[in-house]
C-alpha cells in the first residue's frame, strides 16, 4: 500500500515537472500566455509564424532592388576580385564593376520567389518534435530550422534562375573581362572561380538574413503578429 502511494506521488511530481518545463520553454520562445493552449495549437502558431516570416522574406528579396538596395544583403564583388576593386575603378573599369554587381543582385532577386514553395513544404513537414526544438531555441530558431531543412533544395532551385539571369545580363562576359584585367596586373594570382555558385550562396545568405529579421519581429513586436493565431499564441509576455 505504501509502495503504491509512493508511486502515485512520484508520477504526480513528474507530471508537475514536465508541465513546468513546457511552460519554461514557452516563456523562452516569447510565447504569450500559453496556459490553456494545447500542444497542437502551439505547433500551429509556430507554423503560422514560419509561414508569415517566409512569405515576407520572399517578398522583400524577390522584388526589384530587394538585394541591390538592401546594404545588409547586397551581393558585392567576389572575394578574389574585391582587393583589386579600387585599383580597377581607378583604371576606368568602374562602370563595368557597377554593372557586374547590379547583375549579380538582379539574379538573386529573380531566384528568390522560388523559395516560397520550398519553405511551404518544410512547414508542412514540421513535426511537434521540431516545434519543441524551435520553442526552446533562441530568437532565430525557426530560421535555423529552415536552413537545416531547405538549404540543399534552395541551392538546387536557385541555380537555374541565377544562371539564366546572369547569361541574359551578360554577367559572365563582364566577369571574364574583369578577371582578364585582374590577371594582367603583375604578380596577380589566377584562380578558378564559380561566379554562379557565389551568387547562389550569397542569395541564400540574404534570404535567411531577412527570414531571421522577420522571426525576431514576430517574437518581439505585437504589430508583426498579423493573424489571430499569431496574436493568440504569441500574446502577452509572460512575467
Regions found by a protein language model. Give the residues of each.
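Mid-length scaffold segments of soluble, non-membrane domains
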Residues: 93-165
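Bacterial N-terminal signal peptides
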Residues: 6-15
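N-terminal Sec/ER secretory leader and immediately downstream segment
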Residues: 23-101
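A cross-kingdom marker for long, charged
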Residues: 27-33, 203-239
Amino acid at each position: 500500500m505504501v509502495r503504491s502511494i509512493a508511486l502515485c506521488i512520484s508520477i504526480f511530481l513528474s507530471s508537475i515537472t514536465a508541465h513546468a518545463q513546457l511552460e519554461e520553454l514557452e516563456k523562452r520562445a516569447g510565447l504569450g500566455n500559453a496556459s490553456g493552449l494545447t500542444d497542437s495549437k502551439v505547433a500551429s502558431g509556430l507554423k503560422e509564424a514560419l509561414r508569415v516570416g517566409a512569405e515576407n522574406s520572399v517578398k522583400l528579396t524577390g522584388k526589384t532592388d530587394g538585394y541591390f538596395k538592401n546594404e545588409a544583403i547586397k551581393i558585392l564583388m567576389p572575394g578574389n576580385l574585391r582587393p583589386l576593386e579600387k585599383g580597377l575603378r581607378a583604371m576606368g573599369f568602374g562602370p563595368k564593376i557597377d554593372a557586374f554587381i547590379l547583375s549579380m543582385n538582379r539574379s538573386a532577386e529573380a531566384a528568390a520567389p522560388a523559395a516560397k514553395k520550398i519553405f511551404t513544404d518544410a512547414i508542412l513537414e514540421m513535426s511537434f518534435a521540431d516545434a519543441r526544438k524551435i520553442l526552446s531555441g533562441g530568437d532565430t530558431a525557426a530560421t535555423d530550422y529552415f536552413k537545416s531543412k531547405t538549404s540543399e533544395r534552395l541551392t538546387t532551385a536557385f541555380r537555374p534562375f541565377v544562371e539564366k539571369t546572369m547569361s541574359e545580363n551578360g554577367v559572365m562576359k563582364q566577369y571574364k573581362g574583369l578577371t582578364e584585367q585582374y590577371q594582367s596586373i603583375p604578380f596577380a594570382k589566377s584562380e578558378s572561380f564559380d561566379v554562379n555558385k557565389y551568387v547562389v550562396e550569397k542569395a541564400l545568405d540574404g534570404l535567411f538574413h531577412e527570414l531571421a529579421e522577420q522571426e525576431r519581429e514576430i517574437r518581439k513586436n505585437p504589430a508583426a503578429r498579423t493573424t489571430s493565431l499569431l496574436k493568440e499564441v504569441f500574446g502577452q509576455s509572460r512575467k
